[in-house]
Regions:
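Short, well-formed alpha-helical segments that are part of the catalytic scaffolds
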Residues: 13-26
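A conserved acidic beta->alpha catalytic loop
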Residues: 38-48, 93-94
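Glycine-rich, basic loop-to-helix element that forms the pyrophosphate-binding segment
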Residues: 64-81
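Short aromatic/hydrophobic "clamp" motif used to bind/position activated sugar donors
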Residues: 86
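Conserved donor NDP-sugar-binding/catalytic core segment of glycosyltransferases
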Residues: 98-130
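A recurrent flexible, glycine/aromatic-enriched loop bordering the glycosyltransferase active site
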Residues: 146-166, 182
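Acidic donor-binding loop at a coil-to-helix junction in glycosyltransferase catalytic cores
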Residues: 182-189
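Non-catalytic, C-terminal membrane-associated alpha-helical segments of glycosyltransferases
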Residues: 225-228, 232, 239-309
């Protein structure tokens, strides 16, 4: 039986986080411990965690709001783990069944050193978000490496740490997640792993409930940050175009909406897609924009306060 810890960064955790702890505690392969790295001690209710009476130990570490960094905060949490494997999750992802951890660790071998889960939409997700999850997380598992870039394009390095398992030895060898990055720390890690000759597995059998109904402006900000990351790491993303993948998703979503009799959703799809494209386009050219506009467009405003644009 493989020994594994679960790492969860939190910020103002709500009831879904406590459901997550409850479901992790009842896994067929339970974690050795759950490591919570929480931003803002005043927002965390440790008594509520104790009230769950979990069999799995929950270890909580607090950081200040201005200390949070997508990569570095997770790296810090990994240092509290001594298991040969660890799983990174977000506070709003819920295991769909008791086999999540078991399925996540099953593909690990001499070549596969990162396995990420399938995300299926929450019950309240709309038609557009449902199709987006279906598009990004198909029913068939995948093995990806440097040799599969021609097959998967920009998605070759896609390995969402909403729910993903990592092998400690290779993680330490690579140096962990890239610190002080605006976003995409999970993709950057997957790319570094592949460049070391290792492989990434998308495991469709490992399933979590996770989806968002983002507004157009939120989509703009998120895609702005994604594009900024791609500009800042040109050597990694060179030759891997996101635009074509985006067009395929939009056209596929439109066809799906017509097929299920939801053509009335097309205007919203056009609006959301336009916001995504505008954000991505602006992010690709962020170096030419005034600092106030860059900060306005970004969803990670703290990042720009610590950085000269």
């Amino acid at each position: 039986m493989k020994c594994v810890d679960v790492i969860i960064p939190t910020y103002k955790p709500d009831q879904k986080f406590f459901q997550l702890l409850h479901r992790l505690d009842r896994q067929s392969l339970p974690p050795q411990k759950i490591i919570v790295i929480n931003t803002g001690k005043e927002f965390f209710d440790e008594e509520a965690v104790d009230a769950l009476h979990l069999q799995t130990p929950v270890e909580v570490h607090h950081i200040e709001v201005d200390e949070f960094d997508h990569g570095q905060t997770r790296n810090q949490a990994v240092k509290y783990s001594h298991a040969p494997y660890f799983i990174c999750m977000t506070q709003d992802a819920l295991p769909a069944n008791q086999k999540l951890i078991e399925h996540l660790l099953a593909p690990m071998d001499e070549e596969v050193k990162l396995v990420y889960a399938r995300q299926v939409p929450n019950q309240d997700a709309g038609h557009i978000e449902r199709y987006t999850r279906q598009y990004n997380y198909p029913k068939k598992s995948q093995i990806k490496s440097e040799k599969t870039k021609a097959v998967y394009g920009i998605k070759n390095y896609f390995a969402s740490n909403v729910c993903a398992a990592y092998e400690r030895e290779s993680f330490v060898e690579i140096g962990g997640f890239v610190p002080k990055t605006i976003l995409n720390e999970d993709m950057l890690y997957a790319a570094a792993l592949m460049k070391k000759g290792k492989k990434v597995c998308y495991c469709a059998d490992a399933v979590v409930f996770h989806s968002h109904e983002y507004s157009g402006l939120r989509q703009l900000s998120r895609n702005f940050d994604i594009a900024v990351s791609q500009v800042q790491y040109k050597d990694i993303f060179a030759g891997l175009k996101s635009e074509k993948e985006g067009i395929r998703l939009v056209l596929g979503t439109a066809r799906h909406l017509f097929k299920i009799g939801q053509a009335k959703e097309i205007p919203r799809l056009v609006y959301i897609s336009g916001c995504k494209y505008l954000g991505f386009f602006m992010g690709k050219h962020y170096e030419k924009l005034p600092k106030w506009l860059v900060k306005k467009c970004s969803s990670n405003k703290k990042y720009w306060e610590k950085k000269d644009v």
